[in-house]
Swiss-Prot record:
Stretches with biased composition (Basic and acidic residues): 1162-1177
Family: Belongs to the RNA polymerase beta chain family.
Gene designation per UniProt: rpoB
Catalytic activity: RNA(n) + a ribonucleoside 5'-triphosphate = RNA(n+1) + diphosphate
Enzyme Commission no: 2.7.7.6
Keywords: DNA-directed RNA polymerase, Nucleotidyltransferase, Transcription, Transferase
The name this protein goes by in its record: DNA-directed RNA polymerase subunit beta
Short name of one Pfam family: RNA_pol_Rpb2_7
Highest taxon, organism lineage: Bacteria
A cellular component term, taken from the record's GO annotations: DNA-directed RNA polymerase complex
Assembly information from the UniProt record: The RNAP catalytic core consists of 2 alpha, 1 beta, 1 beta' and 1 omega subunit. When a sigma factor is associated with the core the holoenzyme is formed, which can initiate transcription.
Top-level EC class as recorded in UniProt: transferase
Function: DNA-dependent RNA polymerase catalyzes the transcription of DNA into RNA using the four ribonucleoside triphosphates as substrates.
Record Gene3D superfamilies: 2.40.50.100, 2.40.50.150, 3.90.1100.10, DNA-directed RNA polymerase, subunit 2, domain 6, RNA polymerase alpha subunit dimerisation domain, RNA polymerase Rpb2, domain 2
Amino acid sequence: MTGQLVQYGRHRQRRSYARISEVLELPNLIEIQTSSYQWFLDEGLREMFQDISPIEDFTGNLSLEFIDYSLGEPKYSVEECKERDVTYAAPLRVKVRLINKETGEVKEQDVFMGDFPLMTETGTFVINGAERVIVSQLVRSPSVYYSGKVDKNGKRGFTATVIPNRGAWLEYETDAKDVVYVRIDRTRKLPVTVLLRALGFGSDQEITELLGDNEYLSNTLEKDNTDSTEKALLEIYERLRPGEPPTVENAKSLLVSRFFDPKRYDLANVGRYKINKKLHIKNRLFNQRLAETLVDPETGEILAAEGTVLDRRTLDRILPYLEKNIGFKTAKPMGGVVAGDVELQSIKIYAPESEGERSINVIGNANITRDIKHITPGDILASISYFFNLLYKVGDTDDIDHLGNRRLRSVGELLQNQFRIGLSRMERVVRERMSIQDTNAITPQALINIRPVIASIKEFFGSSQLSQFMDQTNPLAELTHKRRLSALGPGGLTRERAGFEVRDVHYSHYGRMCPIETPEGPNIGLINSLSSFAKVNEFGFIETPYRRVDPETGLVTGQVDYLTADEEDNYVVAQANMKLSEVGEFLDEDIVARFRGENIVTNKERIDYMDVSPKQVVSAATACIPFLENDDSNRALMGANMQRQAVPLINPESPIVGTGMEYVSAKDSGAAVICKQPGVVERVEAREVWVRRYVDVDGQTVKGDLDRYKMQKFIRSNQGTCYNQRPIVSVGDQVVKGEILADGPSMELGELALGRNVLVGFMTWDGYNYEDAIIMSERLVKDDVYTSIHIEEYESEARDTKLGPEEITRDIPNVGEDALRNLDERGIIRVGAEVKDGDLLVGKVTPKGVTELTAEERLLHAIFGEKAREVRDTSLRVPHGGGGIILDVKVFNREDGDELPPGVNQLVRAYIVQKRKISEGDKMAGRHGNKGVISRILPEEDMPYLPDGTPIDIMLNPLGVPSRMNIGQVLELHLGMAARYLGIHIATPVFDGAREEDVWGTIEEAGMANDAKTILYDGRTGEPFDNRVSVGVMYMIKLAHMVDDKLHARSTGPYSLVTQQPLGGKAQFGGQRFGEMEVWALEAYGAAYTLQEILTVKSDDVIGRVKTYEAIVKGENVPEPGVPESFKVLIKELQSLGMDVKMMSINDTEIEMRDTEDDDDHQSADKLNVEVETTKE
């Protein structure tokens, strides 16, 4: 036997074929959501209030400060919020202090700032009763970026951009004449020296001293028309504010507000970190030759003589001095925008290809502290210096698609940005109120208007592109949705503008973003998934773990470092499958490793790090595909995506051939019930599990409090699947923290179970599995193998109308007793009733307009004292295809104190449950992207059977394998068969699973034939088939695309208002479009009458279609068609363009077009007692 036994949770053992021992546990898979939101509550909110406070009025007399904040307790629990359609939120209270500087009076108050949505334990939000997920956004990090460009003459130039988090952009570029220009905030370009002069370096000499003498600078100075700081300031002002009279003061204040005002220009922590890193002097000194001697200013010791080449070792030696004081210069700008000195660090080196003739200045920004979030003159000088250095081949250009230059905005930051918008709107209101109200009687509460804050938060959760309705089809879909990374959304890319490069897999994605899991279609590459081991650091960069190699001994240690993409670029990383000795020494001399995206073979001394696990490359969903290494990546992509569409079955099975990820995925998804504290199980019911805690008191373990875990039973998920939890522990079990107490949907014994293990044969059968179709045995229908439960919710509300309130009642006009048999005395359907399409769910009547009474009605009214009620039937009925059994009914009444929308007095919700067996037309798939539609369900006796008489369950077409190159399914098939014979479950982790020899070994152990095939007998004749057939156990899942949801038919129904043609689509109960090409087909056959009928009475000849209906009802001949409505619309359109269009008959008389009144349909319909609906488009 190969492989070793591994325990997954309490109930499942698997034989694992993994050879590489895992050094690191998988992190909590939804940590990206929970930790980000926690940061927001702890620090993000505080930062916001500090940024905005104090708010002062225009005179500086009143000052409003935000001191502290606290979140209260939510009003309802998560379950109650879902039931009542409210938001799961807690009240936010802020302590505010108002200081009157004239009188010295101080007022403090607690101000309520609205209800703030809270995150549930599983990383979701409940907004208006629906669970939503905030997807993390991938955006360009604020920083300074340099890129090379080649013009049409083949000349190499450069562009650079300083991108802040918010504020004006600075762009540098060269032109064909080697002049360096700057653009401020996307305006027309200026020579870069104009900006330098405006900063206070007014003369040519100062600029040359700063940047060093070079031809690019002299070209730029020639182009520059200004010669002093004042002129430069005026020049810039004219560019930024054309048409306004320029003054030096205005120009200064404009530049200050654009770049040096923290309220208008913000780099954020991450921008400051990136700029300091990029513009630090050490990066440009590496491997360069010094053109000056470096001396320690304190001791006078020579650190590096002129002409020294600064290799890694020398640079590391002088780095502490570089950080401290070497090359520090203080530039003194005169009369520039910013008063005060500019700290710089400048060192001269020889230009790389000048053989020591030309020296260039390298200016760094002297590492500005992290507190300064705006750009400084030092940054601008250093960024210009870097640009000139690039022209002499010193420094690197940046790759914008590198994950070192893209960062994640998770929930916390997205919320913070939204909250900032609300607060800044509120700030304006506060300022205005300060100047209007009486200063003595004023209070903080009277100043603060919380409306804009609440509105901006509501808007974010309700309508932001990144706030999405949670995909709850199954636990894997839930988990993946929370780990999704989107490049779309506000401040991100748009589908149309995103090019090929942004979407492509990049080497820096390794271990950070999954190269496989992404949608097919227009969003490919823009929506990604976080890799299994990845984490997000404080700056929002994705990090991946690596095992450190000790540089002294060369041994791989157990210590794990998380590296960002740009840190990883400095190291050589070995793969996880390198052979190691007991102590961690590399056994091979030559090692395959990665360095900056290149695969290299190098000696073991050069290795700095090693991968922690083979599956760190892929996401959670992709890691659930066994034998992923044997599948083509296009098919693996489909496999990963289709697992998320698996419908939860009534009795699911976890896969016989799994990957070991099933347990972790299920546990972290939030669908299972997890034990919070260790203890012993005291009671187990369908709806509840009681755990008595163990508490440690003076070294003794004693019984403590009782924890009661509630199960969710038969709840409708967001996608209409059934969400049901069932306990898997027994009374007396000792449970530990983090253990699974109850399975959720699509789980078995604590493991993910999306489908069932079925017996599959690769063979054709009368052509029924042509083009990926699937032939299935009737046993799978009879034994409810692929039966799923679907729950739909229908609601009806009784409102106040102008003519009086609507009423929910059993007394409905023109409805017989038979139709009311399942309604209770209130007029609401009873629980457990079986309903079909069109049945009543809630009886409701709406008052009609009061008409003039006839003599008879007046007489009746006089006798019985009440007018016959003028109401019309507006009851809720079961829509087409919605029949089933009533699972539950919920009634909310305004009188009982339930919160209802304005104008609604009563709300009734009915839940209908359907049990759907698998049928022809349903879509099924394996885990390797092998999908198909069921074409035929055969009786069990007609299915081919094995020599022992067992009929197979499913037949797949063997032609689906070779061209698709997903051989993983064949290996799974054989290994699954062997495992079923042996009665074991298997774990074959991705990239470290069962090899070919392991599979053959297990096949032999199971006593199967040595070609792993078998003879099959035809169930119809009993004859054996000509060739041996591959038969085995494959894990097949039923997908959410079910034929019941797609089948649709209509005779009459709603029509579009303008064209009077039937609406389209199942949701609108529309018709089938008979389009242009279908018309050609009938024309080609010369079927004139059929065609005329289709274009008139079956579509938009309004009078004709009612008459036709009448003729059919009365059994008469169908009348002559009239003029279609769309023809009238066309004529009206032409008339509206000013043309005089008339319709003439054959004998040259004008045909009068009668404008159809809205009532036409209804008048004719009333005569016939037919229902006709007209709907607005």
